Amino acid sequence: AWRRAQFAPLLIDATHVSPCYPYREQAATETPEAYGQRLAQELEATIIRLGSDQVIAFVAETLGGATAGVLVPVPGYFKAVREVCDRHGVLLILDEVMCGMGRTGTLHACEFEKVTPDLLAIAKGLGGGYQPIGAVLAQGKLVEAMSAGSGFFQHGHTYLGHAVACAAALAVQRVIERDGLLARVREAGERLQALLQASLGSHCHVGEIRGRGLFWGVELVQDRESKAPFDPQLKLHARIKREALTHGLMVYPMGGTVDGRYGDHVLLAPPFITSDTELAMIAELLREAIDSALASV
């Protein structure tokens, strides 16, 4: 919300539905599958209310990134969403700028969900940070529709398809394939999950540890039972980042996890080649950083 606020007068309004956020929104009497179906029903009801002829697409991150701290979809959620979109002629657009290109253990995070979107946004892992590059992958039917029409695509940029950036991206993808790094991400992810649970799973101010592959989020709470967040004025996430840096660990902090104002979390996204020793250090140093930050609150 805070990123959008200053540009709001220039932007087209979009309708939002509830995110897949089981830690806070799944009812105690509800199974994960039932929760996912409820969200899909909400999406369908919203499309019907607006009129399917007025809805061009449903856009979501396959795994929520910076805004909410690696929200992992419940089983069947995206399959149900895909079915809703197909019934109403609505495109499914998935944003995998953060979670895609191997970060969660498959090249595309949506592979785990067994869903194919109509459009897929990718970036960070595409070039591994060596060159700035992003891409939009489109299903053939969309490309064919444009080709059979005017054939004119007026959304290019000056450095679109830059040869050096594309060469870097190709080199990164070749290394990922050559060195079997997707399998390594899956293996390391299981190890990191176990280490984080051992280090922070019973921490009185850690609400949830969630993620997949080498993409993890830790949500902080004032009270585990009520899930009450900390006062946003404390900026706990920023304190944790500062403490983590002093301990030699880089994390991605963010506030507003719950509703755009309340809530704190930190993201972990270590390199695909992180060793087991380094994974253990990450879990240990994050625990130390959280404890040090809380001591100053």
Tell where the protein language model's regions lie, with residue ranges.
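Conserved N-terminal phosphate-binding loop of PLP-dependent enzymes in the Aspartate aminotransferase
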Residues: 1-297
